[in-house]
């Protein structure tokens, strides 16, 4: 099993940090389906220090166990990241993850995320500052490099390891690729061979077969599931079962999916409040219903609703119609 410092994961399948997706309630749900580790949404370190309400909400920490309390920080100022890391440790975080992989323009233009891969000197200072600031393990998530000419993830991983970083996750694309093309899992093997700390493969892990292929091609210690978990929080358990037994575990029945969707919907509304919760829940309802009969009509109807009870009734009506078709 994977060990991050003194923390041992129960599974080698990790839920990726995803802005606007991996909030407290989604992490809680996916953890229940067997994720070895769940990571918060990316939080801007400077915003964390000034304690913006949004940043504090993003880092809401699950106290169930250490593998539920991993917070991802972004930023380019070593002292600011260090202070934010210490703040999160004081709030109960058990692992700090550093974002060196986000390709979004607004993040890169602030010289954060994957832009940091272009400055190995600054990267080293950030690693060292974060590790020195806290007693808990610090990890990093990166890409292969900035572009095809600068695939420096193996070098950066070595720098990270020397600085005290305890785990490296690599998305198998460059920043310039964004999410186009296919993730290069074979390249991640170069990172695995460069360091002794755990290496996690990320990118295009959308089903159990791809998870197995990614592990085989990368020789990584585990996989990180991102967009593949949209509307399928149970994917983690399917992958885990397949890797352990070689058997394909079916998705939950539609009846069970209805229970999961209703539970998640209610948790969102309870956590954010009705006015904010309903709009946030809409995207999840869209992902959950994708591929089911008449899902477009369902999504269209839900997107026009603001009353939480009406949305809940619509969810039940939609899934009941799917069940009756079977």
From Swiss-Prot:
Catalytic activity: a 5,6-dihydrouridine in tRNA + NAD(+) = a uridine in tRNA + NADH + H(+); a 5,6-dihydrouridine in tRNA + NADP(+) = a uridine in tRNA + NADPH + H(+)
InterPro entries: Aldolase_TIM, DUS-like_FMN-bd, DUS_fam, DusB-like, tRNA-dHydroUridine_Synthase_C, tRNA_hU_synthase_CS
Cofactor(s) annotated in UniProt: FMN
Keywords, comma-separated and alphabetical: Flavoprotein, FMN, NADP, Oxidoreductase, RNA-binding, tRNA processing, tRNA-binding
Major enzyme class: oxidoreductase
One Pfam family here: Dus
GO MF annotation terms: flavin adenine dinucleotide binding; tRNA binding; tRNA dihydrouridine synthase activity
CDD domains: DUS_like_FMN (cd02801)
Superkingdom per UniProt: Bacteria
SUPFAM superfamilies, per the entry: FMN-linked oxidoreductases
EC number(s) on file: 1.3.1.-
Residue positions binding FMN: 17-19, 72, 141, 202-204, 226-227
Positions of the catalytic residues: 102
Function: Catalyzes the synthesis of 5,6-dihydrouridine (D), a modified base found in the D-loop of most tRNAs, via the reduction of the C5-C6 double bond in target uridines.
Family, similarity comment: Belongs to the Dus family.
PANTHER family (UniProt xref): TRNA-DIHYDROURIDINE(47) SYNTHASE [NAD(P)(+)]-LIKE (PTHR45846:SF1)
Name of this chain's protein: Probable tRNA-dihydrouridine synthase
